[in-house]
Amino acid sequence: MERGQSSNQRNNNNEFILPDNFSELSLKTIENIQRRCRKGLEPGTVRYMRDNRCPGYGWLLPGWLAEERVVASGRVYKHYYDPSGRLYRTQFEVLYAWEKAGLILLDS
């Protein structure tokens, strides 16, 4: 084993699978996420990014992203990111952050 590597080596590939119609604001958020990301991924993990143009994510504000992280076992983890790249683990956390900022989400 080389120096600086752990026995449980992680995949340092932090690339995302993106839809074709991602907005410029969403791409900027991706850059911020990559800048903040320090840990690699478990081998076999795939990351799909969604923005407010994707089905089921129309509730997100422009620049906010949802990540669907599929691990080797097939389990899907959802995470959310604000435009600065900050991670939110649940939709409730996102809505709470918006409420603290004075924003209100109205269901249509």
Regions found by a protein language model. Give the residues of each.
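Signature of WW domains and closely related Tyr/Trp-rich beta-sheet microdomains
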Residues: 2, 29-108
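Intrinsically disordered, low-complexity regulatory regions of plant transcription factors
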Residues: 1-39
